[in-house]
């Protein structure tokens, strides 16, 4: 009999990366383990199985991997949210806050139809700057963002609370204390 997969132990932690004092949560080890990847996707999908979801929006880059798998499981379309200048057609953009300043992300202007139910998916939520920007971008196009889903939450950084304050429920599979 197969032993149950512990998602937390499937994620590698790299100390002092990308700078001293940071504990980097490397999800590539989970993605490379077929059983762990499958379990993570199944758990992200489970609350919405049987629910009408029009689109899954994934943030560059690991949100593309997870979001594509979730979209497939839910028979929903997939919408990439990218850094400014990376999409080839007419776009809508939004500026968002990072720990170290501002950045911009964009989405194709025709990626979401007003009223579509969208779930935002990414690998990790920390301060919530990127996810807050993505929610704002989707809402700018008229989407109803029904949830934001992450494999990892770093609750000490408060990002999930920022998303919930926007009226968007947050689902995270595991959490790591600290940064």
From Swiss-Prot:
A single GO BP: purine ribonucleoside salvage
Domain of life assignment: Bacteria
Molecular-function GO terms, alphabetical: adenine binding; adenine phosphoribosyltransferase activity; AMP binding
Associated pathway: Purine metabolism; AMP biosynthesis via salvage pathway; AMP from adenine: step 1/1
Described function: Catalyzes a salvage reaction resulting in the formation of AMP, that is energically less costly than de novo synthesis.
GN (gene name): apt
Name of the protein in its database record: Adenine phosphoribosyltransferase
Family in the record: Belongs to the purine/pyrimidine phosphoribosyltransferase family.
An annotated GO cellular component: cytoplasm
Reactions that this protein is recorded to catalyse: AMP + diphosphate = 5-phospho-alpha-D-ribose 1-diphosphate + adenine
């Amino acid at each position: 009999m197969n032993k149950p997969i512990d998602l937390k132990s499937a994620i590698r932690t790299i100390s002092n990366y990308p700078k001293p004092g940071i504990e980097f949560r490397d999800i590539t080890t989970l993605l490379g383990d077929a059983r762990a990847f499958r379990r993570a996707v199944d758990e992200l999908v489970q609350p919405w199985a049987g629910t009408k979801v029009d689109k899954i929006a994934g943030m560059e880059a690991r949100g593309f991997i997870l979001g594509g798998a979730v979209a497939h499981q839910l028979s929903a379309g997939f919408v990439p949210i990218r850094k400014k200048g990376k999409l080839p057609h007419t776009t809508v953009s939004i500026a968002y806050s990072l720990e170290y300043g501002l950045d911009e992300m964009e989405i194709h202007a025709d990626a979401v139809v007003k009223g579509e139910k969208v779930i935002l998916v990414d690998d990790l939520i920390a301060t919530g700057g990127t996810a807050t920007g993505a929610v704002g971008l989707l809402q700018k196009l008229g989407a109803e963002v029904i949830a934001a889903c992450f494999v990892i939450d770093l609750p000490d950084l408060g990002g999930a609370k920022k998303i919930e304050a926007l009226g968007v429920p947050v689902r995270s599979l595991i959490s790591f204390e600290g940064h």
